[in-house]
Amino acid sequence: LKTQIQEGADCDLFISAAPTQMNALDGSLIGDTEKNPDGLDLIVTDSRVDLLENKVTLTVPEGNPKGIESFDQLAELLKNGDVMLAIGNSDVPVGQYTLKIFNYYGIDETAVANKLTYGNNVKEVTSQVSEGAVDCGIIYATDAHSANLTVVDSATAEMCGQVIYPAAVLKGDKEDAAQDFLAYLQTDAAMTVFESVGFSAA
């Protein structure tokens, strides 16, 4: 989504699955080449809020054929080459959180590459798990919920940090309407809907 916005896609409000993508559009961070490497100034900085929190989960196909129960067990299975795991590419947030989990367990991605399959986004990873093409996958709690997948473990903040979804209004001719909608998304009524699909308030 960040790339589409950067390339000029029509967008009034952006909710990102990680701060990294929002930072790259935030003009208040121009000069910080790590956070905003292209010097973009596309969001209304004052509108930016941390809207939601998600969890990074370990999910399994129906029946859990490998009997996977935890990230601890997954780490051992990966090191022994005894599991097929679906993960997101390193340029998407779910993949970035996964690499933090690998780092936490001292797993070298290249050393276990033959036991990994990749998705260009979290939906592709979810599909691989749903179809039983892999033994397990690392996806968000919300995606597991919508696909009716079994979650066997959730990553802690220590393992991969918190999964915060920032939201911000994009600069343009619809800033007032987008700001009103963003305010609505922070109400109790909206949060009830978010919580029903696996999110929590940030």
Describe each PLM feature range:
Residues 36-39, 48, 65:
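GST-like domain detector, emphasizing the conserved glutathione-binding G-site
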Residues 2-6, 18-19, 25-27, 52-54, ...:
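Exported/periplasmic ABC-transporter solute-binding proteins
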Residues 1-36, 42-44:
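Early extracytoplasmic/lumenal segment of secretory-pathway proteins
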Residues 44-51:
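Active-site acidic carboxylates
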